[in-house]
Amino acid sequence: MFALLFGGILADSLIKRGFKVITVRKTVNTIGFFGSSIFLILIPFQDTLVNILVLLCLVNTCSGICQGGFGVNHADLGPKYTGSLVGIAGSIGMIAAIFSPIVAGYVLEFSNSWNLIFYICSGILIIGGFYYLLFASAEKQFD
């Protein structure tokens, strides 16, 4: 929760300082996605439960911070239609939420280890982070 607030405050303060909205969105999103990816990659190399829990907390922190990026980008694209855009994007995003536990079950059955799952999640974050860097826009597209 605090990371969500921090991500929003960070993004707003950078915009108020004169940074372009798209630059701020991409920066905050990059911190969140690539930060989470790094911490997920480090998890399999830990020997203690405490270290793993700290890394998982850092993953969640980065996930909250990136909400100041893609999480509010809908309002940039179509201020009048933000609710509809969030609903459509959320519905599409739920497809992954439906299939990821199934895929994780197969991966666990195949590998008997969570390590591969952490690597897959990290890879998805890296791909998503680069995709956002390349294609994200803050220009109003729906008026």
Name each model feature, range by range.
Residues 10-11, 15, 103-112:
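Interfacial helix-cap and linker-helix signal at transmembrane-aqueous boundaries
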Residues 21-27, 106-124:
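A membrane-interface helix-boundary motif in multi-pass transporters
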Residues 24, 81-88:
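Cytoplasmic loop-to-transmembrane helix junctions
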